[in-house]
């Protein structure tokens, strides 16, 4: 595996572990701006690195999650359903990363189901 890709997989897995914990904390304390900023920063970093490395599937998932997190930063209330949806996105990203590590390329497939759910949630919390 390319060193840059190996480092990306390692760092992203570490970030995802932190995200899991932070999302649970955020669900318990949705008005905590520090937790929200940390979550947003981690997702934004993952998205940006995916774009740099040419991983469009991962980038699209991270972008959709980042957009929803941005709504929370703008003051929209975070529901349990929204946090669960972001956790499902994190799980999907982990699955894709496992395949990326094994196959040394992003797996084929689409994530329109999850991205559409995230987009619908953005519309719901944004209105």
Predicted feature locations:
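Non-catalytic helical tethers at domain boundaries
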Residues: 1-127
């Amino acid at each position: 595996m390319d060193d840059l890709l190996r480092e990306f997989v390692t760092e992203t897995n570490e970030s995802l572990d932190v995200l899991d914990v932070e999302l649970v904390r955020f669900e318990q304390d949705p008005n905590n701006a520090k937790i929200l900023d940390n979550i947003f920063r981690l997702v934004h970093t993952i998205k940006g690195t995916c774009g740099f490395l040419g991983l469009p599937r991962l980038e699209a998932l991270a972008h959709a999650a980042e957009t929803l997190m941005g709504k929370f930063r703008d003051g929209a209330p975070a529901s349990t359903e929204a946090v669960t949806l972001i956790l499902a996105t994190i799980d999907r990203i982990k699955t894709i990363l496992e395949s990326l590590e094994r196959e040394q390329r992003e797996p084929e497939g689409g994530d329109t189901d999850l991205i559409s759910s995230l987009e619908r949630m953005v519309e719901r919390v944004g209105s």
